[in-house]
Amino acid sequence: MIYRLVFIALLISVLPSCTHEFSLNEVDAERKIVLFCMPSTLGDTTLIQVARSRVIHNQGTNTDSKPFLVFRLNGEEKEIHYTEVFTGLLPARSYYVVEKLKENDKINMEVSYPNLPVAKSQTVIPQAFPLDKSEVVLTDGEYGKKIQFRIAFTDSAEAEDYYGMRVIKKTSTAFFQPENSDSDTIKYTSVDLNLDNEPLFSEKTGFDDIFDISKEYYRNLYIWDDSKINGKNYTLKVDTYYDAGYENEERKETIEFKIYLYKLSKEMYTYLKSLNRINNNDLGGYGLAPIRSHYTNVENGIGLLGGCNVYESEWISNPKE
């Protein structure tokens, strides 16, 4: 169960903080429904976060009216649950559906509030990530040893495909003396991968090339499309610094990795790409480039309904020298 909790926490982290209000500062903006939902094949719980935008210049009072939600899976309406408090698995004041999803499942959603147009959206769970083989190996780097993640996969030539990758590092510290066992710890962190030698990520154009600006990926979720590899077999290679862990007379620290590979719907890929553009738009803050906005696929609203098919590896031991 802890692995599912880690994944849901990571999934939530790529979404904006969503409470009862979402501010819009455009002078001509109107209140809109805000919907964020990212159905996936991992686990059986689909989180739904719903709110209403609040126009900053509008000084009117807010109401406590509840939204009305409809969640249809392949045309069949499903029961929607609600939690008022944080559960350890779900955020406070969030909705959720308990249903195991699979590839090609079609999800339609509707959200309505009094005096607001009904917000609608839809998505489809993509086919599975076409993984052929994954490896975690120790290699020589410019400044010492490094860990390289190699992902071999076969892209389909029949459609446009969208992918993602994220690596989680687990650091476990265990004390040898029984009286210190309560101090044992486990820490999970997302891995900041070096992309410089991977052609799918490292190409720079325009201002990025002129000013040698490196692209960063929001929350270390690395995404790409198949425009360079359509219909081909390909091995993606990315790396990070080598942390050997340690062991002494008192304690032992061990390192493990878990790889998440995503097949993304076009909607979800486009949304994540817009997040990356916004976070990398340093020049926009100086008036040298246009300020970009978030992508949305919610009709009469704001937000995202985007599906993904997730591959989750087992925990992989740290390579040894």
Protein language model annotation of sequence segments:
Residues 14-17:
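C-terminal motif of bacterial Sec signal peptides marking the signal peptidase cleavage site
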